Amino acid sequence: KSLEPALSDDVKAVLVCPTGGIVCPFLMTIALAENAAVNGVSFRFDTAVKSLSHDASDGHWNVLTAAGDTFEARCIINAAGVYADELHNQVSARKLSITPRRGEYQLLDKKAGTLVSHTIFQLPGKMGKGILVSPTVHGNLLVGPTAENLSDKEAVNTTQAGLADVMEKGRLSVPSLPGNLTITSFAGLRASEAGGDFVIGEAEDAPGFFDCAGIESPGLSSAPAIGEYVAELVSHKLEASCKD
């Protein structure tokens, strides 16, 4: 209580992680994309993959887009989020099954930003880490997410029931959460794979096809390490050398 006076009196014990931290996920993503661009990556936005095929004669992959464009590659990295199973299952007999799991958040005004000074987690359950209450790098307060399994892989809308659940569950940790200071709300989809874990690496029966699938929480924290690991795998596969 000395560290977090706003915590509920019903809290019996806590685990403090002094090395934990926060980032802005939007700015982090943009920064990584900028770094990729500097290193030669070319982005193709709004370019859906229609089909994948492997040419055994030269080991190359052929990618056909929904617009009819084609690409040829020696390796493919499958980081397609909730659609990663659909791409993987085109090329591998070991099937993946990804369920979109919606999480809804509420963002509170900076007037509530000092209510807590750490990211407050509840005990995790089978659907994830539960509702958290966290400061943001911009001085706001973030509450969420919910966890709702869906069939629609584009359902990123918020719901009245979901947002009510965010505030109700958040107040189990911090009873004084001021819902009237909510300035916006949003939702996203985690890619929850049936096996319950990340799927990272080269598909055994699809040489040159590398999965980064089923990356749900703590995917943001894991992303830099996953990126470095997969880069090493691909570099080894291509016998590539470091750039000067």
Where are these regions (language model features)?
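Short, surface-exposed beta-strand/loop "edge" segments at domain boundaries and coil↔beta transitions
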Residues: 21-24, 70-72, 218-220
